[in-house]
Amino acid sequence: MAEIEENTVFEINDFTIVTDMEHFGAAFEGILQKYEFSSRRPCLSNDVKYRLIVTDTNMISIGENKLRIELLQPVPASSNPSNDVEFVEAPKDEIEEDAHVIPFTVAEEVANLKHGFEVTDSFLLKFGIRECIIISPNDSSGTFTDENQVNTVMGNIKTILHSSRCEVPVFCYIKDQSLDMISGYASDGNSTYNFSSVVLRNINRRHCSMTDLLYLFKEHLGASISAFHEEVRMSSRFTHVVPLKQSKYFRNHTVETFGLLATGPTSSLPFDILEIAATWRFFRENSLTENHSHSDFDINYSSYWNIKMKSTKSSLLGVLDEILGVYREDTRKAIRSDLNCALILGKHYTQKELPNAFQKLTINSASEVKIGKHAETEDSGTNGPMPPALMKSWVNFIFNEAESDNESLAHELNMLNAASMSENQLSDDELVNNVKLDTLFNYKNPKSANTFLAPYKCAKKSTVTWRLAIALANARVFMSDQPRAEPQLWVEFLLKLREKYEKMETVEKVYNGIDHLQCSFSQKMQMLQLCIDARQKRHRMLDSAHSANNSDEFFDANESFNAETILEPNNEGRLKLFGLNLVEIPDVPMYIPVTQDACPLTDEMIDARNEHLFSLDEEDRVHLQMELVKSDMQSFKAANAGAVFADFLRWHSPKDYDEKTNTISERMLISNNVWVRSWEAALPIPVANQARIFNDTKIAEEILEIFNNATLDQVREWMKPTVFAATLERLTEIESSYGVSEEKQKQRTKTAKILANATLNNTPMDYNEISKYCSQIEMIHNMKVHLMQLFENAREKMHPPYPSETDVQSAIKQLVNIAVHNLWDNSTDEEPTFVIKPQDPIGRAIAVIGKLDELTEQQLINGHRKEYIFNWKHSCPSTTTIPMTHRMYADLRSDKHSLYFSMANDCNFSNSSYL
């Protein structure tokens, strides 16, 4: 071979250009090779229910347009979508030996009469196939604008399908996918199936009955009617939307349910539509007739019914959603809630002249203290939208005071009930039904426990705060048309709280100091109660001192008193004998002094105190922390004249004094010890004359001032943890009326833990999740109660045999599952179905609920939606060809008629055929 010269120039003569369509064809063929669709596809068993899912997606470009290629394959309905069906290909040798050993899968599935209205997949219902490839535009800019473009693409696809020996049907959408205009093709090399759809907007009358559609089907095939032809097999489904008679739901307020957190619908019952899809399974041509004037399709004698109960989401929202709705930002507020409650009431509130808080802080001596109950409150209050008797009952409920006049409360509640029903006149039956419903909605569990599902940081169930939260929430519901009822109740609560404080009456339960596991408002109420307790204790001490001494005997200072005067022993402030004698005066017994209590602290006060301590220098910080010890030293010196530091340690800190060796511990002997310095500086002052460490008057007035100045938003925020806890606990109580599954119990416990975290850390996201959960659970409860009432009323009107309790509960569960599936936006699973036979007891009960016997023949003919499936085994295009099954599915609605054709042909004229 001669060597190529260095400057040799090569000339390229091949200028082949790859078109966009050729590029598309090559890419599409590569996808088919990836799927290995080059042989017969197996027929799936009819014993297993399958559903079509997208198992793979690819993108192909035609010029600047991008097409999405999706593979839809069947998986068992009960399996995980990832567990695809394994398709086993037939051996190639076997196919070549006898082409009819394994039939053309598409032909078998189109002819399958079980592919009727029992299926739920769109392509299976429309065309009768269970596996396909779908070509659709990836966005609106890449749509096929007319059938010519689709025919060009489908022509290329047909060539590829034949050359690759792929039998899987391929569909292509025309224009926008929502129009549902489809063209498709499938072939096994010998016969073909062409798929197409027709969507009609301007409805022609000839397309509106089964008889007309049958003629249209045969005309589309170009078939002449002959007595020798096999009869067409048909199936039909008529959907009837029956409005249920809806009377507005009125809450029936009673004395028994007065203190329960309200539940149930806000105004209307959940369900207002009964949807029945009556199906007649495949029957022969001419066995049933339907035309413009007559129909043999009696809904009560169909093969089976598919039942749904429908409603809008807004009508399903209940009272608890309204109660928790004030904590959502998107909730429209009826009144301004950023104002003080007294300002919201405006002219409806008579302001009370409360004593100035500073006046109570200037008490310097026992002579200025008023002993016993005093300071009767002046007449004041509100005259807002809530009647006085009802307001009094609410306040008594909050403070757990016995209602002295239940008859008056019952009268006010009856007036409230009458006012809500005055707009509509209800019949006696409707009133009875309303009372029955109210009993079910306001179920009260007599065995309800006082414990929580999780450790919420909120008020406990037996506290005033818990009852206040329920009362304020119910005020928003009981008088929803009067938004000022809530601030009115808050103002009345404060007036009663002030009155009880002045009279030193119990305002909250407190056991061992402030309970830091409760919410901030509950801690404030506990602090207020501790202030009342401290005030009572101080008054008892003063009363005791007054009775023990002559009222005219006083220990006044001598006129010659000066700095050198030696104080005489003072016996004031002694509680009891300690049991030991003084160290330096062995003959004198030692007394335990009356001491001050430490100031109880709420969480907010602890945070404020810690912040203040960190701002001080070390000396001032120690001085502040020794405040209580210094008070004890003063009390001890006053009770034990002549006592030394060692005596104080023997009582206050026994571990720092050794009785055997009579020595003080080393830590107390450190030079410049703060304890020693404090002892030397302490004066003998009994506790009655000391400055109060726990200034109950100041703290109580500060709390009451905070309450008085709070805006409605602040009040609601204080109640927030308790309201959410009360809502979740109320749902748990009403769920116990019909029982819940173990799975739901676990979900409830999980939700309770989320709420516990929300109340502890005040996380808005957790509160929103709880609000959504409570709203959903209440919806389900309302639906169940409504269905229970509907079936109970139907039982009273129907003849035996009656549906069993098990059948009714099963029906309620399935109907609720369907309604819930259609409501939640995140429902991705297949819609559940409720199938019954019309003549079964439960079917007859449904018929009574929907009053189906009252449907006229014209109502039956003009159903909300009519669907037909036509199957015809017919020789096409000529009588000499092999008979193949043709299929048409018709979907007739008020605004659109859609026809879907699966047309067979045993002739194949493609030059790529592998005959």
Swiss-Prot record:
Entry keywords, A to Z: Cytoplasm, GTPase activation
Coiled-coil stretches noted in the UniProt entry, renumbered to this chain: none
Molecular function terms, GO-annotated: GTPase activator activity; small GTPase binding
Subcellular location: Cytoplasm
Keyword Cytoplasm: yes
Protein name (database record): Rab3 GTPase-activating protein catalytic subunit
Physiological role: Probable catalytic subunit of a GTPase activating protein that has specificity for Rab3 subfamily. Rab3 proteins are involved in regulated exocytosis of neurotransmitters and hormones. Specifically converts active Rab3-GTP to the inactive form Rab3-GDP.
Record InterPro entries: Rab3GAP1, Rab3GAP1_conserved
One Gene Ontology term, aspect cellular component: cytoplasm
Originating gene: rbg-1
BP term (GO), one: autophagy
Lineage: Eukaryota, Metazoa, Ecdysozoa, Nematoda, Chromadorea
Organism: Caenorhabditis elegans
UniProt subunit comment: The Rab3 GTPase-activating complex is a heterodimer composed of rbg-1 and rbg-2.
